[in-house]
Amino acid sequence: MTKHFISKALENMDRFGGSFVQSLAVCYRKADPDNQTILYNAFEHLFFKYVKFKDD
């Protein structure tokens, strides 16, 4: 997990995600590093989904 990976995933979560995923992106940005790790570990599948997301 790199900063670029997280940044791209969050950008796509904001742009293409539903209300839950958009809220998760907001929470992640506001969280301290320990809580960011908790959120990432709990929702890793969503981070991977949105880092690869293409609007075709």
Tell me what each language-model feature is:
Residues 1-27:
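N-terminal acidic leader/helix
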Residues 1-4, 52-56:
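Short intrinsically disordered terminal tails
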Residues 21-55:
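Short, charge-rich amphipathic interface segments used for partner binding and complex assembly
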